[in-house]
Amino acid sequence: MGKVLVEAKGIGLRSTPSKLNLVADLIRGKDVSVAMMYLKFCKKKSAGYISKVLKSAVANAQANYNVDLDNLYVKEVLVGKSFSLRRVHARARGKACRVHKHYGNVIIKLFERI
């Protein structure tokens, strides 16, 4: 087991945590190159958000620690709830109701294989 090399965060992503978690399940425990390929061919909107965070983590690892890309793997992908925007939606007979637009957070931790 390697040590924690790098952590990248995506805060306030315009997708719900449950939708982000569907895509995050695809890349947990995979090598970085395999995870990037999975995200490239995934058609979900959340895959684009997670792909950006993963690329940021890889860039941080290469810039700060001079790590080879082939030795990196995705150890953890943490998905959490961020803020919710509340909007008003007009309804029948002069009434109104609230619409909640949920946002999510993603934290990706990369480890190095020994």
UniProtKB/Swiss-Prot annotation:
SUPFAM superfamilies from the UniProt entry: Ribosomal protein L22
Cellular component, GO, one term: cytosolic large ribosomal subunit
CDD domains registered for this protein in UniProt: Ribosomal_L22
Entry's transmembrane regions: none
Source species: Ehrlichia canis (strain Jake)
Superkingdom of origin organism: Bacteria
Keywords: Ribonucleoprotein, Ribosomal protein, RNA-binding, rRNA-binding
An annotated GO BP: translation
NCBIfam families (UniProt xref): rplV_bact
Keyword presence, Signal: no
Protein name: Large ribosomal subunit protein uL22
Record carries keyword GTP-binding: no
InterPro entries membership: Ribosomal_uL22 (IPR001063), Ribosomal_uL22_bac/chlpt-type (IPR005727), Ribosomal_uL22_bac/org-type (IPR047867), Ribosomal_uL22_CS (IPR018260), Ribosomal_uL22_sf (IPR036394)
Its biological purpose: This protein binds specifically to 23S rRNA; its binding is stimulated by other ribosomal proteins, e.g. L4, L17, and L20. It is important during the early stages of 50S assembly. It makes multiple contacts with different domains of the 23S rRNA in the assembled 50S subunit and ribosome.
